[in-house]
Amino acid sequence: MTTKKSAEVLVYPIFTVRWLAIHGIAVPTIFFLGAITAMQFIQR
């Protein structure tokens, strides 16, 4: 708890599994939400 470096070593190695799980869901979700909201404004 004295240095920030020891905390960063414990916090940051979770970059592969959690990062892929979050972005594997979040990136297509944001893309489809943007596509659906864009479709609302298309006039025929």
From Swiss-Prot:
What would be one Pfam family of this protein? Answer: Cytochrom_B559
Q: Where on this chain does heme bind?
A: 23
Query: What name goes with this protein?
Result: Cytochrome b559 subunit beta
What is one process in the GO biological process aspect for this record? photosynthetic electron transport chain
Q: Where in the cell is it found?
A: Plastid, Chloroplast thylakoid membrane
Q: What does this protein do?
A: This b-type cytochrome is tightly associated with the reaction center of photosystem II (PSII). PSII is a light-driven water:plastoquinone oxidoreductase that uses light energy to abstract electrons from H(2)O, generating O(2) and a proton gradient subsequently used for ATP formation. It consists of a core antenna complex that captures photons, and an electron transfer chain that converts photonic excitation into a charge separation.
Tell me how this protein sits in the membrane.
Answer: Single-pass membrane protein
What cofactor does this chain's UniProt record say it requires?
Answer: heme b
Q: Which residues cross the membrane?
A: 19-35
Q: GO MF annotations for this entry?
A: electron transfer activity; heme binding; iron ion binding
- Domain of life of the source: Eukaryota
Quaternary structure note:
Heterodimer of an alpha subunit and a beta subunit. PSII is composed of 1 copy each of membrane proteins PsbA, PsbB, PsbC, PsbD, PsbE, PsbF, PsbH, PsbI, PsbJ, PsbK, PsbL, PsbM, PsbT, PsbX, PsbY, PsbZ, Psb30/Ycf12, at least 3 peripheral proteins of the oxygen-evolving complex and a large number of cofactors. It forms dimeric complexes.
Q: How is the cofactor bound?
A: With its partner (PsbE) binds heme. PSII binds additional chlorophylls, carotenoids and specific lipids.
Family recorded in the similarity comment: Belongs to the PsbE/PsbF family.
Keywords from UniProt, A to Z, are: Chloroplast, Electron transport, Heme, Iron, Membrane, Metal-binding, Photosynthesis, Photosystem II, Plastid, Thylakoid, Transmembrane, Transmembrane helix, Transport
- The answer to keyword Phosphoprotein applying to this record is no
Listed under GO cellular component are: chloroplast thylakoid membrane; photosystem II reaction center
